[in-house]
Amino acid sequence: METKDRGYFAPANAREWFERRSYSHKEFKDVAKLARRKRELGLTVSLVLPSRNVADTVGGIVEEATALNEEAPLVDQILVIDADSADGTAEVAAARGAEVYSENELLSHYGDAHGKGDAMWRSLSVARGDLVMFADADTKDFLPQFVYGTLGPIISVPSVRFVKGAFRRPFKSSEGLELDGGGRVTELTTKPLFNLFYPELTGFVQPLAGEFVADKELFSSIPFLTGYAVETGIMIDVYKKVGLEAMAQVDLGTRQNRHQPLFDLGKMSYAVLRAVARRLREDGRLRQVRDPSTPDSLFQFSDYLHAVATPEGLKLREHVEELVERPPIAEVLAGSRD
């Protein structure tokens, strides 16, 4: 399948963008051709895997990326940013040839890392590639197309600076496999919020996908929210920075990763909601959402209360998480050189 260079355009809405900026991994299956184009452009690529207790999957992902490189040199650096996992994640990744760092050793003067988003932000301090691609480290049956498909549009189409992976998300339960039952936070929280407040972004099939790539200059110019708010914040901030015309998505097929308990999905949804509300507040589109005399849930610690019925009776569980925003890494690294 021949890739169409759809060039620069200013989309009038999400529908037009969807038609012009949606690709398939099949368009880039000629990996030798893609690698030649990468070489002609003088580009280097860092693949970053934020990891926490994924010893059962991270090794296979590193092996797949390495094997793809033997066929076509698309990835110049494989980085695993480990959350001091207790299951040997770091050792497994290092044994497969990845460059491994503890998330807490990078930019350590910022204190201990606050979850996935912080690990991704800190990775930019050691990522050497002109392009930085992130991928989830808990993906089962990781396929080469997750790498070359994600990289395809940003290497092949000059006006594209950000690419988001898209895929079907199966959900496996005791009743069998539901082909599109995964991605519950995306379907029940993110997409309704984007339809309401950021309709330009509603053409993205998987806005929270962990597989995405941008040029390092772009990633370095935007702030990163910590924890599970990171993907939502990046989507909004990239859109505001470069516009919809520089963003694309690519169909990667089917992907299956770990499924979170319902309570954890609630916390993830809360993080997405806080990220959207925070950006709306900064843009002057949202007033204070709590009593002014109480701590601001968008900028400080916030209690997430979860009432449940259990065999032992009714329980009120509490989760406290700080929503931290790290500054653009370019500012941090520039300051360290002064």
Regions found by a protein language model. Give the residues of each.
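Short beta-strand-to-loop element that shapes/binds the nucleotide-sugar donor at the catalytic cleft/hinge
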Residues: 161-181
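N-proximal low-complexity "stem/linker" segments adjacent to membrane-targeting elements
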Residues: 1-64
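Cell-envelope/extracellular polymer assembly enzymes that use nucleotide-activated donors
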Residues: 44-46, 77, 238
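Terminal low-complexity segments of carbohydrate-biosynthetic enzymes
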Residues: 1-21, 260-338
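Short aromatic/hydrophobic "clamp" motif used to bind/position activated sugar donors
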Residues: 132
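Conserved donor-nucleotide/metal-binding helix-loop-beta segment in metal-dependent transferases, i.e.
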Residues: 142-168
